Amino acid sequence: MKTLLYIGMSLFFIIGVVLLFVMENQRSEAVQKEMKMEMPKEEMNLRKATFAGGCFWCTEADFEKLPGVVKVISGYTGGNKENPTYTEVSSGTTGHVEAVQVYYDPSKITYEELLDYFWKHVDPTDAGGQFVDRGAQYRSVIFYHDEEQKRLAEESKEALSRSGRFQKPIVTEILKFTRFYRAEEYHQDYYKKN
């Protein structure tokens, strides 16, 4: 009787392990499939740029108008809180800014063109926010993903400073990109929904 009990328990354990493995494998395949659906094959050669220009609703809408920009995602970056919420970022205590992640086709639009567009849609002399949105979470920042983006961002900022277009100094920060947290779904394509 004990032998049958041990065999039954062993079989139950083995079946449980196999089921867990199968379920985890299916979940992993589903996640991979979802990622592929989110980024079609022809979009795998896209480049990424990250900008903070005040309220991400407006910044997202601005960049989505550009030919060569494939996708723009609103989110949070630059701070120290993992997985922040809109309420937390809005409080100004996380160090994050509202930002957009721009996926673009470099054969249709260059990073330099994105920078030029960015400068035309922010007040680069205002460290306290952008337009009616006040607070450090609304300041303008260019987040670079590699040394080439850093160089181009610094050169464009210097050119803007020399242009004489602004009386005050350019205070937009240029910071190394660390991590981007996608904003809640109701913030995505906000201008289309409202």
Regions found by a protein language model. Give the residues of each.
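Flexible coil/turn and secondary-structure edge motifs
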Residues: 2-194
